[in-house]
């Protein structure tokens, strides 16, 4: 499916936002029936020191076998997996909600051609969700999803 085929109701910018907070709001909107596109997933952040965050992901990756469980390495897939954990994905309602979410590395909507349109016909700008921004942290320790992906061995294409 190309970018143009997914007509999002809302575009969310995840740049410098906390992954879990954005994912929970995106999951709720998807469950409410909105089509949500999340852009700049590689610039979203996970709080905690890089050593702590990477140890969790490495331990998760080491457990299991060739058959699974398999965990994503790309930042857009890591973000979508976080959203999946917040919807009842084994039920029809959750599967449909997960289908209403698209996560992108970078911003395919920046040119305005495929952007969702408002009531006046103008392209809708990507919004930053309330209470998700990194500036609300008193803790300075965080790591971006792009860095996590790179350390997990993903091919850096962003």
Stretch-by-stretch model annotation:
Residues 94-95, 106-156:
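Strongly charged
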